[in-house]
């Protein structure tokens, strides 16, 4: 399942999660982001245990700034509220598995 993460639910869905959370910073006008969205949907369907959140940088500029997002798509894996891995650009399913391993 892919969650829509905002500044209002970030603490509950991400910081307080005991499971790793994969965050995708994206924008609707970004073509690589759209392709990444398709990859994430497929990944989520085949990995139902994975916690995945999408953050629209245009709607949540504070969160994008907090993570220092300069390019999109940008992916971050957080565990216990701390960034443990990150990647920039379109990622494959295998790369997503590697990020979450």
Segments predicted by a language model, with ranges:
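Conserved Rossmann-like nucleotide-binding pocket used by diverse enzymes
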Residues: 1, 6, 26, 53
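Structural micro-motif
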Residues: 61, 67-76, 94
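Residue-level signature of catalytic and energy-coupling elements of molecular machines
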Residues: 10, 23, 40, 56, ...
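A short beta-strand-turn-helix
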Residues: 3-20, 61
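Conserved helix-turn-beta segment immediately C-terminal to the redox Cys motif
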Residues: 18-20, 37-55, 61
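Conserved redox-active cysteine motifs that mediate thiol-disulfide chemistry
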Residues: 25-38
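Non-catalytic, surface beta->alpha helical segment in thiol-disulfide oxidoreductase systems
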Residues: 77-101
